[in-house]
Amino acid sequence: MTDRSDPAEVKILTDSLDALGVKNIRMPAPRGPRGGPSQCHDITVYPSAGLAAGACSGYGLLLNIKDPLHPVRLQAVADSNFSFWHSATFSNDASKLLYTDEWGGGTQPKCRATDPIDWGADAIFTLRNGKLNHVGYFKMPAAQTETENCVAHNGGLIPVPGRDIMVQGWYQGGVSVFDFTNPAHPKEIAYFDRGPIDASKLVIGGYWAGYYYNGYIYGSEIARGLDVFKLTPTADLTQNEIDAANLVRFNSLNPQMQPKLVWPAAFPVARAYVDQLVRDNGLPASRTTAITNALRSAEKLSGTARAAALKTLAGQLDRDASGASDAARVRALATVVRGLESAK
């Protein structure tokens, strides 16, 4: 270049450049601490609890959002078994928090019999006084094939009173419904699995998510369209529990703006609690039978006669709670019965 101020006066040099010999090349020394991921894949907010959970690729965040304009970071958690922290779900009482690991970005088969149970799974934490404590994992239990992309993905709560139940999509692993009321021992209680799209080769597809909404489960299947399911009773989920869940209605639902689930004072809710006491031996069989009969009799009454019968039953339940192995559930049942007593 003959004149730097005039780009038109440029000459091309055709001679080659000489490379100088350089020895002992060293990487520059770091100029500060190494940073981690600087953004979150998903953030689930739970306004009624004043909390938010960020799934932030390499770790999970817990935030206090009681003042939404000034959120406070409470804790960050990591797990060497996790590849990609993807999404989060709170239990309804905010005593538990579940994070998903989308190992391989949802495009790999990670549910084979040879895959560890804690890879591409859900990590479950207890949450107390703003602190998380890891207690368990959940992974859909049915082994999948080499031609099925499968990993934990999106889902949400099913509003069964007294229990923490979630429905979740696992890509070609299907839709899984599981109970994490005991966070150290989660258990699958229902599932739907179409099988591989192509048994001879991996074709990406499966359930991106499973969500419960007003009595139905909606599964968005990437390759095969939308599936709609209804729950059916089993030993792990009674018709009374399903009926109680169906009483919770939404006008709209944003799964990442988690709503507080509230049940009306209704006989199906009371019977759901009784079924749980029977299943878990929370009261002697003689008492659960008597409570069932008392509820049936009260439901046939009306006005002051019904209120009097329910008041008597509530008092009996208060006494039952003092010696019950599941006192909290008995007290919850008593609260529902008192709500029925005062209902018009």
Spans of features found by a protein language model:
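Soluble extracellular-acting proteins and domains
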Residues: N240-K344
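Feature marking well-ordered beta-strand scaffolds used for ligand recognition
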Residues: M1-L277, N293
